[in-house]
């Protein structure tokens, strides 16, 4: 589980006029807090009741909403509340002991399908964490048949909308074609550090 790339999120917000963010996989709430420092409205979806209640107890900020449930079930209704393009930080997968989702370890393709059904999908940004887990069978204790391949992730991202797709470090990036120069600028900046 990597951290939300804040500088990239800011660049995309400014370039594309994004005013909201959605995170799948709250875990300890760091990602939600980081996104809230960039966006006025943030929703973070968590399947583990223990992690959800801990985040609700320990983290509070105006415009930040924690949502309990399966991202696959929650996203369609949530997307009706978001009237503009958004940044999606997709990190809602089973990560071993202390996390939820062992029955469906990686609902990523279903999350993408839910986002793609939204009228704002063509202008939204999808940042998918843990790209390394799609390059081959994930390590134990994961069930390989629960995880899509990198090609199936990329194919799903291309199915309904024209997007610029790339990988950077441990992240799949899917943005509207107009944001390609933003991604290239981010690459150059990060690569020189």
Pin down the residues of each PLM region.
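A short alpha-helical cap/connector motif
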Residues: 1-87, 93-193
